[in-house]
Amino acid sequence: MRTVLALMIRNRKLFFKDKGMLFTSMITPVILIVLYATFLAKVFRDSFTAAIPDMITISDKLINGTVAAQLTASLMAVSCITVTFCVNLTMVQDKANGTRKDFNVSPVSRGKIYLGYFLSTVANSLMVNGLAFVLCLGYLFEMGWYMNAADVLWVLFDMILLVLFGSTLSSIISFPLTTQGQLSAVGTIVSAGYGFICGAYMPISNFGCLLYTSPSPRDAHESRMPSSA
């Protein structure tokens, strides 16, 4: 266990040493929440208000709070998955620069080596998505806060589960990759495709029947965000 911990610390130090990767990872949630609030808020609001019958009147605060919950759930669903591909770059870098050859001839099992990569990815991703979580709570507070302490803890628990899933997914996909270009290409595909699949870029009701009826990670977040009605 001490060996795994040492490998995890080593991988985390490499992540913080690469200022470009660290800055990109930290700024991504900020950019996402600005883009979501600027461009997607109106799309979600129009989709929500269009489904309300004319004889029913709902306050703007309730509508804004519901839309903000949808946007933050979408952001967390995307960020928890895509950020892990960025912070897991150390795994591929070690293969590209030949460091893995040194590990392979050392008296350390490959299982411990990969466990060190996985744990460092989880820790770094939790740090980045923790920032996104705080920003989302601030956005909810500004638009229409309605959650209690238990709701916040459940959403935090959902975030941890998604980070574990994203770290596992990125570790599996990154396993056969040997260059940074390959990981960048995979990360781009995952970022674009996953955002649409989980309904982050547009309301799922606008999709076809297959995606409309399939559960997504965003549903888990929304299920933890009760309606203020």
Range-by-range predicted roles:
Residues F48-I63:
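Perimembrane loop-to-helix junctions flanking transmembrane segments
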Residues A6, R10-L14, K101-V105:
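Short amphipathic alpha-helical coupling elements at transmembrane boundaries
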Residues I31, N64-Y139:
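Hydrophobic alpha-helical transmembrane segments of multi-pass membrane transport proteins
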Residues V34-V43, S174-L211:
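Transmembrane helix segments
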Residues R10, L14-S47, V67-F85, L126-N129, ...:
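Hydrophobic alpha-helical transmembrane segments of multi-pass membrane transport/permease proteins
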Residues M1-M8, L211:
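Short, membrane-interfacial amphipathic segments enriched in basic
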Residues Y212-A220:
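Conserved small/polar residues in nucleotide/adenosyl-binding loops
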Residues R110, F118-Y194:
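Alpha-helical transmembrane segments and their short interhelical loops
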